[in-house]
A protein has these predicted regions:
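Structured binding/interaction patches within domain cores
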Residues: 2-142
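C-terminal binding/interaction regions
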Residues: 2-3, 17-21, 126-180
Length: 180
């Protein structure tokens, strides 16, 4: 079998993609996403107190943001947080673990920062009698997005517009950030 010759990658191939952004951009978003996810992490930890995977994912992405951990190990931590989400039964705990997994996955692809919407969903699921729980969490997230975080989020292309609660939250957050 003949091997294809190695070729130089083009400038376009070396540039960060629209959903990926630069490593510096991903570091900025990672800290914000981890802060958002951490607000609901206790919902997971209450259901699965010995499972540290979502917390380790947040610790890992913060280490990435400080330049102390490379992308590969953080991706593995993100995958582990998502595995933890699949293994816990409580819907609020699932959403909280997914928020942690997406925060960690931001190290690899900036668009995962939009996964903070899972934290808002977790807050809503944990407070079914509070009709404002989701909106209040989204407001907190946006209020705690620094001007640099907002500018970085604006670099992302508009999210897809499929139906469902998660997509609606992501699209609402994107519109609110894009608007100012």
């Amino acid at each position: 079998m003949q091997q294809e010759p190695m070729r130089e990658s083009s400038d376009k191939e070396r540039q960060p993609g629209a959903l990926t952004l630069s490593e510096d951009d991903r570091r900025v978003l990672a800290v914000w996403a981890a802060d958002c996810a951490e607000r609901t992490l206790s919902l997971f930890e209450a259901q699965s107190p010995t499972d540290k995977r979502p917390r380790e994912a947040l610790d890992g992405v913060r280490a990435f943001a400080r330049g102390e951990m490379r992308i590969g190990p953080v991706r593995a931590l993100a995958a582990a947080a998502h595995a933890a989400a699949r293994e816990v039964g409580d819907p609020a705990a699932v959403a909280a673990a997914r928020a942690a997994g997406h925060a960690a996955a931001t190290a690899h692809m900036a668009a995962h920062a939009r996964g903070v919407a899972y934290a808002a969903i977790a807050a809503g699921l944990a407070a079914p009698d509070d009709p404002d729980a989701v909106a209040d969490e989204v407001t907190w997230q946006l209020d705690h997005a620094s001007p640099v975080v907002r500018a970085t989020l604006r670099k992302l292309p508009p999210p897809p517009r499929p139906g469902g609660t998660l997509a609606a939250l992501i699209n609402d957050m994107h519109a609110r950030i894009a608007g100012g």
